[in-house]
């Protein structure tokens, strides 16, 4: 056992390969068994490879496996194309036999349909593969064949040399780099092989297209010699058209990775178009006696159909008109009845409304009369009350006025008596006293001091009596009698 435990650890920590990589795992196990028998001293002295080396190796292995799967898919698609080409040829042969077994009729109509059929097929195939097929394509196919043979010989040589070379070590860095380079070369050689196989598949497609073109040309020549023009021939030819178009569409979807197959199919369609043209030219040169009879028969049938259509058309036109008139009449009758009922109802409503209005007016008049009577009664009572109040007021006013007059007379009498007394006193004072005019802020007290020498209450009272004063109020410019 070797001491290189790190390689075992790195191996175990990687993901487990799927069933598609069993061959690769067997080769790795063989390499590891051979490495175990080598010297352990050299392995211990050398450095360990980087961790990413095994990842890169795994990626290269996955790429090679993917290329193998793509190559297998391309081979299966080529086989399917070959099988479909065989089925197309069988359908075309069957359609030719069916046209031979049909009875001839309507000679002028079928060539036109066949020309349209072949022209449509040629136009559709030209649209799907617009590039024409020329001698350059043939020259390119020859060159591709030579290049493919060269690549195949180179790849075989490289595989033989690789099988003779000894297998490298996995332990050292230099050996690891050499192994990665060798495996990269292996990948490139496998890619060259895949490309060469693709070129071979393109050549197979071209051969298939040439075969179909030959079959189509033979069919066109055989159809040019025959006179099958029945309606069943049309249906059979339509079915053949649909089958060929479906097959062509399937071939287009499957021939996405093979460029030269479309060109081969275009050549086939060109052959079909040429056959159709030759058939139409041969059919145009034939007599048209039966066609004239069929046209006359069709014209008579057409006139009979027109007469029947006219008769049926008049009946179809009259029936809806009569039905429409009846419906309109019924609607008019029902409408008139509805209008009459509506008018009668409106009249009755008007009469009822007028009666109601008259009753309301009479009620309003009665209520207005009652209200006026009540108002008159209330006004009369109010007037009587007012008159009574006025009479009582007048009486009270008269009594008061009489009392006032008596009071006024008594007051007047008192005033006269007082005036007389005052006059008598003044006369008495004027006969024996003096006069003084009030100036400034003089009062009875000061005037008494001025004239009597003292302002005693007795002196002041004398002045008051002499002048008829009740209080101490005097004004400027007033003349006062001093007794």
Swiss-Prot record:
GO terms for cellular component: plasma membrane. Residues 1-40, 103-118, 126-160, 180-199, 244-256, 296-311, 358-395 have a biased composition (Basic and acidic residues). The keyword RNA-binding does not apply. The chain crosses the membrane at residues 317-337. InterPro entries: LysM_dom, LysM_dom_sf. This is Elastin-binding protein EbpS. It comes from the Bacteria.
């Amino acid at each position: 056992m070797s001491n290189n435990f790190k390689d075992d650890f790195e191996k175990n920590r990687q993901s487990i390969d799927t069933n598609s990589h069993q061959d690769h795992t067997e080769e790795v196990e063989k390499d590891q068994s051979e490495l175990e028998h080598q010297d352990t001293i050299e392995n211990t002295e050398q450095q360990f490879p980087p961790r990413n080396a095994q990842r890169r190796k795994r990626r290269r292995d996955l790429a090679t496996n993917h290329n193998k799967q793509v190559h297998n898919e391309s081979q299966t698609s080529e086989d399917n194309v070959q099988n479909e080409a065989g089925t197309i040829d069988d359908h075309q042969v069957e359609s030719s036999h069916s046209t031979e077994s049909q009875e001839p009729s309507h000679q002028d109509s079928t060539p036109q349909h066949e020309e349209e059929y072949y022209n449509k097929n040629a136009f559709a195939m030209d649209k799907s593969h617009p590039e024409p097929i020329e001698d350059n394509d043939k020259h390119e196919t020859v060159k591709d064949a030579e290049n493919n043979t060269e690549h195949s010989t180179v790849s075989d040589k490289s595989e033989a040399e690789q099988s003779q070379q000894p297998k490298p070590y996995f332990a050292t860095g230099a050996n690891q780099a050499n192994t990665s380079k060798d495996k990269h070369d292996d990948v490139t050689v496998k890619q060259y092989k895949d490309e060469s196989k693709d070129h071979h598949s393109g050549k197979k497609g071209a051969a298939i297209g040439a075969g179909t073109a030959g079959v189509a040309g033979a069919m066109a020549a055989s159809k040019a010699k025959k006179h099958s023009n029945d309606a069943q021939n049309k249906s059979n030819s339509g079915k053949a058209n649909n089958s060929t178009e479906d097959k062509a569409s399937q071939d287009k979807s499957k021939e996405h990775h093979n460029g030269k197959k479309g060109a081969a199919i275009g050549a086939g369609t060109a052959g079909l178009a040429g056959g159709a043209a030759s058939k139409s030219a041969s059919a145009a040169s034939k007599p048209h006696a039966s066609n004239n009879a069929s046209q006359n028969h069709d014209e008579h049938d057409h006139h009979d159909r027109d007469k029947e259509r006219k008769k049926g058309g008049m009946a179809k036109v009259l029936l809806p008109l009569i039905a429409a008139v009846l419906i309109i009449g019924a609607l008019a009758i029902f409408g008139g009845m509805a209008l009459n009922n509506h008018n009668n109802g409106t009249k009755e409503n008007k009469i009822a409304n007028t009666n109601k209005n008259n009753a309301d007016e009479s009620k309003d008049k009665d209520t207005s009369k009652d209200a006026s009577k009540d108002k008159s009664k209330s006004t009369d009572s109010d007037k009587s009350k007012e008159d009574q109040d006025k009479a009582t007021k007048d009486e009270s006013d008269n009594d008061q006025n009489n009392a006032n007059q008596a009071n006024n007379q008594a007051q007047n009498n008192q005033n006269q008596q007082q005036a007389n007394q005052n006059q008598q006193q003044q006369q008495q004072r004027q006969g024996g006293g003096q006069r003084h005019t009030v100036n400034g802020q003089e009062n009875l007290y000061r005037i008494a001091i001025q004239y009597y020498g003292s302002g005693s209450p007795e002196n002041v009272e004398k002045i008051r009596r002499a002048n008829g004063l009740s209080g101490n109020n005097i004004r400027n410019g007033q003349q006062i009698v001093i007794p």
